[in-house]
């Protein structure tokens, strides 16, 4: 198993490299007669693509989606959905110095050890360029979730560096390039990122994702728990180093009398510390999860490393890189949670019918 496919009932298989001719994917298991609007898929891709602001990579990719199978007259046919996205703005010469050198905290060294060969141009398969495929698959999964159960998956930037961002409204999230949940901290974020860029450094982030209208009963105990699969989905995204469900790591500071989500016949659940999942199965509450993205190591500040011969070297990474990879990660996080929920929804219906 090569690890390029995700899901069991709704399966996305991804292919392509950062500086190859194209990237793309195949979706197998999508139900028939799901309305698909290619413009809506393109909107999702436009949210992820580079060069959207001064604070992300200046690589200019149109990210135009080409759907070539599985959709007829605007509806899915139940057969595999194939799509491809051309790579048009590669600058492979920027990576020539790293043909024989390993960039710190990148996949260069581990890919070389695993395969004995690696595509050093833009990180090859390990590049975040691959996530455009996930966003495409996630857009189709969103259509399935919306049309079958009215499930809505949205995410926002909840922390950047030392700045915790208070949630104000979804309208605020969609009205700025940072996916910041409130208008009051926008100038602080902008100034903070400018300072980071000026110093030639980078910074980490946290993205919070919320899934509403998820029916109770999704999840397969014990090894395919819904929260376990969400964690796997989010951890599979480039640069993610931690995942939390519900209150997550802050649960360690709480008492059972506080954390337990009590409920009454009249009001239902009185809290949602568990993040909408109990015993690995959705409870019918809103599902809440978060993913922490490390600061990218593609920065001009010199760093110690070694080359393929095992000799010491000094590396300074220049070119078109994100000072904060989390800024473009919001639609990717949404996509992976949507893929997970879609997979579990179809598995639940296949096993237990529509309840």
Curated annotation (Swiss-Prot):
Protein origin, superkingdom: Bacteria
InterPro entries: Chorismate_synth, Chorismate_synth_AroC_sf, Chorismate_synthase_CS
Binding-site list for NADP(+): 48
The keyword Lyase belongs to this UniProt entry's keyword annotation: yes
Annotated FMN binding sites: 125-127, 238-239, 279, 294-298, 320
SUPFAM superfamilies from the UniProt entry: Chorismate synthase, AroC
Listed cofactors: FMNH2
Gene Ontology cellular component list: cytosol
EC main group: lyase
Keywords noted in UniProt: Amino-acid biosynthesis, Aromatic amino acid biosynthesis, FAD, Flavoprotein, FMN, Lyase, NADP
Cofactor: how bound: Reduced FMN (FMNH(2)).
Record's function text: This reaction introduces a second double bond into the aromatic ring system.
Family per record: Belongs to the chorismate synthase family.
Assembly, per entry: Homotetramer.
Protein name according to UniProt: Chorismate synthase
């Amino acid at each position: 198993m090569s690890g390029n496919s995700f899901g069991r009932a709704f399966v996305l298989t991804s292919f392509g490299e950062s500086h190859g001719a194209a990237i793309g994917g195949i979706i197998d298991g999508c139900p028939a007669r799901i309305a698909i609007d290619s413009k809506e898929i393109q909107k999702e891709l436009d949210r992820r693509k580079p060069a959207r602001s001064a604070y992300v990579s200046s690589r200019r990719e149109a990210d135009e989606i080409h759907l070539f199978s599985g959709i007829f007259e605007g509806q899915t046919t139940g057969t595999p959905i194939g799509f491809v996205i051309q790579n048009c703005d590669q600058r492979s010469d920027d990576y020539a110095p790293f043909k024989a050198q390993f960039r710190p905290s990148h996949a260069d060294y581990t890919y070389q050890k695993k395969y004995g060969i690696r595509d050093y141009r833009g990180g090859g398969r390990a590049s975040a360029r691959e996530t455009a495929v996930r966003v495409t698959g996630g857009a189709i999964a969103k259509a399935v979730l919306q049309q079958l159960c009215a499930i809505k998956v949205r995410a926002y930037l909840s922390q950047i560096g030392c700045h915790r961002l208070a949630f104000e409204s979804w309208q605020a999230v969609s009205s700025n390039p940072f996916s910041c949940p409130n208008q009051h901290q926008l100038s602080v974020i902008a100034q903070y990122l400018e300072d980071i860029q000026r110093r030639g450094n980078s910074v980490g982030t946290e993205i919070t994702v919320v899934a509403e209208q998820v029916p109770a009963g999704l999840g397969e105990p014990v090894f395919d728990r819904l929260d376990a699969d969400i964690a796997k989905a989010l951890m599979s995204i480039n640069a993610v180093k931690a995942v939390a469900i519900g209150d997550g790591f802050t649960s360690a500071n709480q008492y059972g009398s506080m954390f337990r989500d009590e409920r009454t016949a009249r009001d239902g659940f009185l809290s949602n510390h568990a993040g909408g999942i109990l015993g690995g199965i959705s409870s019918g509450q809103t599902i809440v999860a978060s993913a922490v993205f490390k600061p990218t190591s593609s920065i001009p500040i010199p760093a110690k490393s070694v080359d393929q011969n095992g000799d010491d070297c000094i590396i300074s990474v220049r070119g078109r890189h994100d000072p904060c990879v989390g800024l473009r990660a919001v639609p990717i996080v949404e996509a992976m949670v949507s893929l997970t929920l879609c997979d579990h929804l179809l598995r639940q219906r296949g096993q237990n019918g529509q309840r």
